[in-house]
Amino acid sequence: MSSQNNNKQGGQDINNKKDSDDIKPSVSKEDLINSLKNDELNKNTTMDQNDMKKNENMNIKKNEVLNNSNNVEDGDNENSKFMNKSKEGLNNINGEKNDDNNSIVKVEESPKSIGYNYYASESIENLCKEFGLESINTGLNSEQVKINRDKYGENFIEKDEVVPVWLIFLSQYCSPVVLLLLVAAVASLALNEVVEGVAIISIVTLNACLATYMEKSSGDAIGKLAEMASPQCTVLRNGQKVVIPSREVVVGDVVLINTGDSISADLRLFDVIELKTNESLLTGESEDIKKTIVADNLSTPFATNLCFATTSVTSGSGKGIVISTGLDTQVGKIASQLKKSSKGSKLTPLQVALNKLGGLIGLIAIIVLVVIISLAVIIKYRDPAHADKDPTFVIIIIGVGFAVSSIPEGLPMVVTITLSAGAKDMVKKNANVRKLPAVETLGCCSVICSDKTGTLTEGKMTAINAVTICKNSSLSDENNKLTKTFDFYPTKGFEPCGGLFDSNELTSEKKKEIVIAKNQNTSYDKVLYNYGNPSNKSVIVDKTRSLMFAAYLNSYDTTLSRDPKTLKWGIHGNMSEGPIVVAAAKVGYSFINNPNHKSYLDNFQRLDDLEVTFNSSRKMKITFYKLKTVNVFENVYLDKPGKVYTHVALIKGAPDRLLDRSTHLLEETSMKKVQVSWNSTITQEERNVLIKKNLELSQKALRVLSICIKPLTDQNIEELKKLEDADERLKYVNYDENGGFIPMGYVASFDPPRPGVKEAIQTCREAQVKVIMITGDQKPTAVAIGKLIGLIEEKSEQVEDINSLAIECSELHINKNPNEPILPNDQLDEFTDKILIYSRAQPEDKITIVQSLKRKGYLVAMTGDGVNDAPALKAADIGVAMGINGTEVAKGASEMILIDDNFCTVVSAIDVGRTIFSNIQKFVCFLLGTNIGEIIYLSVAIVAQMPFPLEALQILFLNLMTDGCPAVALSREPPNDDNMKTPPRPKKQPIMTKRWWFYGILPHTIFEALCVLLSLAFSLYICTGFYNLNGIHNLCKTVNLVDVNDANVYHEYKYFCSSYEYRISTDYVGWVTNVSFWDPQNNEAVNFWGAAKGKVENINPLSDIVHPELRLRMQDGCSGDLTLDENGWCRPKDNKTSDGYNDELEGILKKGFEDVTAKGSKRGRTMAFISAVWCEMLRAYTVRSWEPFYKVFNRNMWMHLACSISATLTFLSTCIPGITSILNTTCLLWWQYLLAIFWALLNLFLDEIVPKVIYRRKYMTIKN
């Protein structure tokens, strides 16, 4: 609704109480003076105080006041209610008397009192003085232009600074999780672990690139506002007409505007010639606004004698004084609000939760790093796989590995991929997400504030009923003899095929038959008498067709046409007149049904210059036509003794307004013709019947328009031509010697709810998401729509029940006055906590409602389409702009755009948002559970003096490659059955709740650690014969050699190792002993696998149980500087010295040589690595639901693919040369792979039978 409705007052009951919206467009002298006197009203909430120049002791001329009050019709002084002022003492203000002459009334109060727009009410003469404008005919001089520019500023809206791409990219590295990963990467590179460091940096950089792209693609709302400004403007300067850039326009400039111009600044008009502007960008009102010199309504910020920056001139021309520029204009104030709401970070609940999680992970990483390194130093931990490396270096590498294991490297990437995939899902549901985190934010939305027209409804008004009004009618409604209700049918959007039938006769069966007749292109009369068929001759048809003809002629500038490509019917022109044009076509008034229609219409000459256009103050439109036949309009006879009616005024508008101005009725004569009942005027009883009928229709959610006629003589027309002002013509038509209006009937239209809206609202109710409807409609219509879509229960019939759920937005203001300040927060919050329907709403009311709801702790989604909706969209947690009817500014201020403008899309998006968060919980639980499990089994391995189950690079591989795919698959999980049957999560709820920690993460970490450690111990045992470091270290023999430079320094070298291995092959199953020794024949260190069957301690190379080939190699003993030890193995002699390097030293296992214990340990650890991978891979299956995993096993085929990829990558990492050396893995035998997987299956079994069973019993309802 237009902001011109700002004068709406108080609450409105459903009974016949006249809206205070009925304030007439003029203001009485008494009210204006009283408003100036009233100190309590010396504020202006509609326009900024800063926009009003304070001017005490201002003189107001009585004749100016009287000019304004001349337009007040009799009985229309309801502005007194608006001001709530007594009319006493008008001639004695501040002790100064006012006579009937043009004397001056001195008023000490500032004229900028609340309820009156200063720039609309102030005289042009005083505005000129205020701005230094000497003459409106010459404009400003150059010196005054400079003064005004310095004083009021330049005329531009400053765009937000464009954030460069590189800065957006760098900002992606500021999250705690990403910073931790960067620290781990730097540490890895510093320790020469290049592969690990590069891998981490690559993953983080890829994630930053994705996030940068999404953020950069979002629009700039303030920039869009600035782009709307006209590039140039025509002004008067120094007596000359010049064209200047709009930015150079200053306050006080005289601006000339013409058809097609975009207005550069806010103007006060002083000269207009049929000037109309379109202000829909600001007000949301699609109607062109006819501009006047004298304002229709002084209380609205969008008075008709003002023009506004960024609006366009649709017809006519005019001149005006610039009253505001730049950020002081109406559109500038919107830009200021946008800037204000943009200040500071607007983190979504997910971003907050991820930051908290990152902080927790960082704390864990630091603690783990310090504790593990300290513990490893204390116990002098030495990894057998790196026995030849510096122990301190190994310990630091281990610490970094632990820190890496505590950080879920894949988390940022998976979150980004999840949100991106969710955004794509929403596009499929007609929701375009502009800001990626908003995808998930919808999941915790607890309130949806929705527009009605086009969002909850289809936005396609369709005429449903025609009601004729006629005395002595041969066919009338059952409950009265004055009206008769007819139904248009079928009613399918703008399709003009259909007829007009008696409502009492149009049963469900008849409707089906009519549809069949329509499809077969046969006459409806064969089914039911069509009162809209021109071929049917009856007095009732005369009445219905005359009613629709009058309505059609009044809507002359709206046309109906069919797209030749899509074959869809559409309306061109005023959409609010569309239903009338379509309905008229159904009774034969269209080019479609009547080829000669144009020539027929040409018989009715329209008098364009006399038209009274519709605005929100008049609530009516009047067109004037010359009659084809005097005293006859269509089938209505206007004869009156002594009068010759040559013209007719056709009036269409609000029923209450038109009924107030009606004096006579039509009647049906005994001769079965329709004529005006001039002999009697409308009685109160007859008025009550018409009022009741209007109310009956409006309570069915129908928009009711009254159609009236007023016959005029040639003399009337001549007198009307002398009146330049439309309101004067309205007054004349209403109160001339011919009487007032003659009502012909009502046309009731219905904007049907969108399919699925009622079900969507019920879904929201089940999901405990509050739905609020905000509309410009009157309260009864809004309530009726609310009932129709299920927003209010049908049983809510009592006024007190409805008032507890629906209010007019004026009630949000002090004294129920929309021009006074908003109620205090505590009182306001009481309203917004329970109200579901806000009627008579203005765009500025939306931001008030949003702010109140946010104070109450709700997470608010707000829909909007206009420029003036942008601040509310920005203030809401989730701004939702309309894709079809939305302005670019609204889209730029929003997080999401509804491609189809459909409310159901918002609900679908909430469903997707909840699913996304649920899936984020699942993969965060999955990643944290596996990572903490890694910390536990790595820590226990150190304490238990066992080799590490995994190395640092294996951990990174596990976290990124094998965990990454299942985590992404978890993000594609379908919603749970109760997804939209649970309340929205609180905004401050962490990602991982206590339940997730106690039943999801901690049990799994314990079970995974247990299974991996069991796998490590068992694997080491079957590969080396021992499971701990001491046992493995004792398998090797060493020699201590004196340093060549210092006799007190010794260097320790291994010269022999043995280990045990359990084999399963076709020819042997059992233990074997493997040895590493110095081969004297080849003069090198070698490994001999299967040196002897069984576990042989202190093995001798010449023993009979030793493999013959080994005996052959050692049969000649050692030579040179080597000697045999007690078991017959070569070693350096005791007198041998060393410089600490063993590259040239014989008889030892040189640096870099991988002996049987190292190889056995690697094999055992590879098996543990396989177990860890499969533990985490199978965990992805168990974390999907609290139900047993087999029940949801096949609901997400992506999971099977992801786990197949992870399993394949893991297998390849143990078999492909090069990769195995990087990851320090080795290829296993088939049964060793199976044994490793067995421990993972044990982990799955424990996850299923312990925590999930307990959780289901405690929290889940058992379904019968």
Curated annotation (Swiss-Prot):
Effect recorded for G358S: Found in parasites grown in the presence of cipargamin or (+)-SJ733; confers high-level resistance to cipargamin and (+)-SJ733 and moderate-level resistance to PA21A050 and MMV006656; reduces affinity to Na(+) and increases resting cytosolic Na(+) concentration; no significant change in the susceptibility to MMV665949, chloroquine or dihydroartemisinin; no significant effect on the length of the intra-erythrocytic cycle or on the number of viable merozoites produced per cycle during the asexual blood stage
GO cellular component: plasma membrane
Keywords, comma-separated and alphabetical: ATP-binding, Cell membrane, Hydrolase, Ion transport, Membrane, Nucleotide-binding, Sodium, Sodium transport, Translocase, Transmembrane, Transmembrane helix, Transport
UniProt GO MF annotations: ATP binding; ATP hydrolysis activity; P-type potassium transmembrane transporter activity; P-type sodium transporter activity
Enzyme Commission (EC) number: 7.2.2.3
Region spans: Disordered: 1-102
Membrane-spanning residues: 165-185, 186-206, 359-379, 393-413, 923-943, 1006-1026, 1203-1223, 1226-1246
Impact after mutating T418N: Found in parasites grown in the presence of spiroindolone compounds; decreases sensitivity to cipargamin; increases resting cytosolic Na(+) concentration; decreases sensitivity to cipargamin and (+)-SJ733, slightly increases sensitivity to dihydroartemisinin, decreases affinity for Na(+), increases resting cytosolic Na(+) concentration
Catalyzed chemical reaction(s): Na(+)(in) + ATP + H2O = Na(+)(out) + ADP + phosphate + H(+)
Composition bias, Basic and acidic residues: 15-42, 50-64
Domain of life per record: Eukaryota
PROSITE patterns found in the cross-reference section: ATPASE_E1_E2
Gene3D superfamilies from the UniProt entry: Calcium-transporting ATPase, cytoplasmic domain N, Calcium-transporting ATPase, cytoplasmic transduction domain A, Calcium-transporting ATPase, transmembrane domain, HAD superfamily/HAD-like
Annotated control of activity: Inhibited by cipargamin and other spiroindolone compounds. Inhibited by 4-cyano-3-methylisoquinoline derivatives MB14 and MB10 but not RK18. Inhibited by (+)-SJ733, a dihydroisoquinolone compound.
Membrane-protein topology: Multi-pass membrane protein
Documented effect of changing I203M: Found in parasites grown in the presence of spiroindolone compounds
GO biological process: intracellular calcium ion homeostasis; monoatomic ion transmembrane transport; potassium ion transport; sodium ion transport
Annotated Polar residues bias: 1-12
Family: Belongs to the cation transport ATPase (P-type) (TC 3.A.3) family.
More about this protein: ATP4 inhibitors cause swelling and partial lysis of infected erythrocytes, probably due to the osmotic swelling of the intracellular parasites because of Na(+) accumulation in the parasite cells.
Official protein name in the record: P-type sodium-transporting ATPase4
